[in-house]
Amino acid sequence: MVLPKSKNQIGLGRAIQSDFTKNRRNRKGGLKHIVDSDPKAHRAALRSVTHETDLDEFLNTAELGEVEFIAEKQNVTVIQNPEQNPFLLSKEEAARSKQKQEKNKDRLTIPRRPHWDQTTTAVELDRMERESFLNWRRNLAQLQDVEGFIVTPFERNLEIWRQLWRVIERSDVVVQIVDARNPLFFRSAHLEQYVKEVGPSKKNFLLVNKADMLTEEQRNYWSSYFNENNIPFLFFSARMAAEANERGEDLETYESTSSNEIPESLQADENDVHSSRIATLKVLEGIFEKFASTLPDGKTKMTFGLVGYPNVGKSSTINALVGSKKVSVSSTPGKTKHFQTINLSEKVSLLDCPGLVFPSFATTQADLVLDGVLPIDQLREYTGPSALMAERIPKEVLETLYTIRIRIKPIEEGGTGVPSAQEVLFPFARSRGFMRAHHGTPDDSRAARILLKDYVNGKLLYVHPPPNYPNSGSEFNKEHHQKIVSATSDSITEKLQRTAISDNTLSAESQLVDDEYFQENPHVRPMVKGTAVAMQGPVYKGRNTMQPFQRRLNDDASPKYPMNAQGKPLSRRKARQLTALELGVSPEALSSATSKKHNKKNKRSKQRSGVVIDDY
């Protein structure tokens, strides 16, 4: 039953109308109407204000002083350069930064261990080490915050530096292992100074690992630079040595290097001339043995300390020297956690120091990512490293290696001629199917991680030139990049020619293979949705029911059931009558023969089986 409607129109609509009537303006005053910008301005006059933001304070002061502001849009200039990545420096800024870093490079040191002797207790030594480490951290912070230098992320754990101190104190020769693609970045000159401070008789040696990535001309340039600056060095490749160990080859040479071309080890005069060839394991072992021949009296074994940045190949070098995997190796920086001692021979022992990131000047963090110092999987900002990679690797090399098409903005339209990060990442992501689910756009972050890892691993190769190289870095790597493009184009041309030589022969051969295969496998049937397919001999005679019309047609497309004049199938009753006429029986007899009514009788009554049992 519907409730009676109230005659008193009391409700929300009446309240809204009443409020509108009270607050409507007075039309007798004319068309002029003054409205406060803030509807609660009358309440704000009585509100206590104890704190204001900078913007509110500025506006309130201007309002009290009755100051009017006029916007002068013609004096505003918007500086916008979409082609310049904000996370990278321009060429002029990078040059100024390099010049400033060269003037202050002596201020960037490594922490020193305080002097101690037999009378120093463990508590006193721990306190002195902590104070020295804190003072070193304080000086670096002042260098960054006050003077604005960009310092690479360095090791902040005191325990790791203690491992380095112990390795230097125990070692007779400190071997710095550096990456051949950028040796000066991974070489620490302050470490060499500290080694001489700890023991004047200690010696420094530079082992340039991953030298197989450099061409012969590039190694010649670096060799001349090291010789001019009196830096003892040796080119080495731990990967090639490990592969040769697995093959069991006689490691005489990688590049026709004979035993008499072994660079002389560091003697007192240090006037040796080093070769630009890649040294073998026998050469490296010979240098270590020649060092050990200069042992002082009373010492039976010489210790070599291997130090360097993470992921430069310290553990791989030790494994190649020993001949088996004695040290844990990983592509993740910082795998070795504490120094380890390995006996190479009766006179030589090796100390594997954990990888340390020494403090050094850097222009941007993109350089640290491409040098393999910062882990790529933990990277958040990827446009800077990707743009720097696109500057170093030519567009043709990227297109050749990854079979993509990079379209850049023409110079006539304001482009720089160098692809940006998005112009490289988007085509690569589309070609690999890396798409974002929520927007449907290419997943450039995932593409950036793959390309950056290829750069760090050496697939995208870029070698930094020495400081005395007269030309640019692109000219220094021109030979290697041209080899990649020409080798890939030659292989593609060879495949096309090989395919076009004998198409008929290839097709005939493929037909023979198909015939032989299907004769040996007669029970092969198509894997399609439907009922099981019957196979009778080697000939396929089954038929899956995939469409409704298949039930009414035979294999030759003839109708399976009788049709009427209109081409439609007969009904069940008419089809039964037609069948009865063809068989010469009545339709009732045909229906009774196929009927199921004999199974539908009354089952509640008593059933007689009809079997007679004889009485005996």
Swiss-Prot record:
Its EC number is 3.6.1.-. GO terms for molecular function: GTP binding; GTPase activity. The keyword Protein transport applies. Gene3D superfamilies: 1.10.1580.10, P-loop containing nucleotide triphosphate hydrolases (3.40.50.300). Keywords: Cytoplasm, GTP-binding, Hydrolase, Nucleotide-binding, Protein transport, Transport. GO terms for biological process: cytosolic large ribosomal subunit assembly; protein transport; ribosomal subunit export from nucleus. Residues 247-269, 552-574, 587-616 are annotated as: Disordered. SUPFAM superfamilies: P-loop containing nucleoside triphosphate hydrolases. Pfam families: MMR_HSR1. It comes from the Eukaryota. GTP binds at residues 209-212, 308-315, 352-355. Residues 595-607 have a biased composition (Basic residues). Residues 161-359 form the CP-type G domain. GO terms for cellular component: cytosol. It is found in: Cytoplasm. Coiled coil: none annotated. Belongs to the TRAFAC class YlqF/YawG GTPase family. LSG1 subfamily. PANTHER family: LARGE SUBUNIT GTPASE 1 HOMOLOG (PTHR45709:SF2), LARGE SUBUNIT GTPASE 1 HOMOLOG-RELATED (PTHR45709). In contrast to other GTP-binding proteins, this family is characterized by a circular permutation of the GTPase motifs described by a G4-G1-G3 pattern. GTPase required for the nuclear export of the 60S ribosomal subunit. Acts by mediating the release of nmd3 from the 60S ribosomal subunit after export into the cytoplasm. This is Large subunit GTPase 1. The gene is lsg1.
